[in-house]
A protein has these predicted regions:
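A short beta-strand-loop structural module common to alpha/beta enzyme folds
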Residues: 41-46
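Membrane-embedded segments
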Residues: 48-58
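Active-site regions of metal-assisted phosphoester/phosphodiester hydrolases
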Residues: 1-39, 53, 63-64, 69-250
Length: 250
């Protein structure tokens, strides 16, 4: 029986609406609950700020989704009022290891990729490995290119065999929709057949967010929800991907 996984990638904008600027983590939870994911890759997840009621959003969202396995790394620190934020991976299945890959360039905002290794139970009582890389790239075009090159040459990615199921997803800030094709595809990754516009959420014109896969995994479907809650909960729309892990002997 094929092993399938539903994954959501989303820049949640610190659970703050892109239009109304209202902090409402339950809107974020509602959108994610409707997607019914097995694993979630989130960017701009905040904590420790008065503006966010001192919520630790990774735990607030994880508890609401009944996802006990979590990895979180702070990228940007502001102070007592605005707190800090970073990338998070939440999962229904165990995260066996995780690490953060620093992609920050000189004189630029801190950026990174959160890497997690998951073990997915199979019908026959075994497990399959799935590697996830949750990224949030910079605003400059040259900056983004260099950050992706650093990811490709990082020890974490270099150690993964080409056939091992691997997904790179997140907020690429890819204004022109060419970044992954130019850098990830030549490295063996497969991207979406067509870019899905995700920004701004209420009237999307840019495909800033994306998902690429490599190895014994295929993307069965990649969609962006357009519900009212999805268009108001953040300034980005989420991406929902249905993945199927292929037989390692295929």
């Amino acid at each position: 029986m094929p092993l399938t996984v539903r994954l959501v990638s989303w820049n949640v904008h610190k659970c703050t609406g892109g239009l109304d600027r209202r902090y409402d983590p339950m809107r974020t939870v509602d959108v994610l609950t409707a997607a019914n994911p097995d694993v979630v890759l989130l960017q701009e997840v905040a904590q420790n700020g008065r503006w966010y009621r001192h919520d630790r959003q990774v735990d607030l969202i994880g508890d609401a989704l009944s996802m006990p396995h979590r990895s979180y790394f702070v990228n940007v620190r502001f102070g007592p009022r605005r707190g800090e934020y970073g990338n998070a991976i939440l999962s229904r299945v165990p995260i066996t290891s995780s690490s953060n890959i620093d992609l920050t360039l000189a004189n630029r905002k801190a950026r990174s990729v959160l890497h997690a290794e998951l073990r997915l139970p199979t019908a026959r009582g075994g497990t399959r490995t799935l590697h996830l890389f949750n990224l949030h790239l910079g605003l400059g075009e040259a900056e983004r290119r260099e950050q992706l090159r650093r990811l490709l040459t990082s020890p974490a990615l270099q150690a993964i065999q080409l056939r091992t199921p691997t997904v790179v997803a997140g907020d690429f800030n890819d204004v022109w929709g060419t970044l992954g094709k130019r850098i990830l595809v030549p490295a063996g990754f497969v991207g979406p057949a067509r870019p899905l516009r995700t920004f701004p959420a209420w009237a999307p014109v840019r495909a800033l967010d994306s998902l690429y896969s490599r190895g014994d995994v295929e993307v069965l479907e990649l969609v962006r929800p357009r519900s009212r809650s999805a268009r108001t909960a953040s300034d980005h729309l989420p991406l929902i991907a249905d993945l199927r892990l292929l037989s390692p002997h295929a």
